[in-house]
């Protein structure tokens, strides 16, 4: 980020780090040779910077355990809609045809998360 900023490129470059699921706050109870924390589809984190994103903003929160989203929930379709918006694309117009029907990449539920836009 420092390098992009020093070169004057951060405002025109969208940087994203994250994934579409988080990790459960508890350890798996199944034991075995590879104990760890399972996927958690109820809470995930994404870091975004530059390219139209407001700096220093935290959007949403989990419960006290970090197990589930508690406020300002963002669905993966919302994340995709927001990314497409920041890239200058209208997610509602971006479709693909499958089995004779047009589908949106963000389904019918995706909305741009306006609170993080600069």
Please give the residue ranges for each predicted region.
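Ligand-binding pockets and gating/stacking loops
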Residues: 1-118
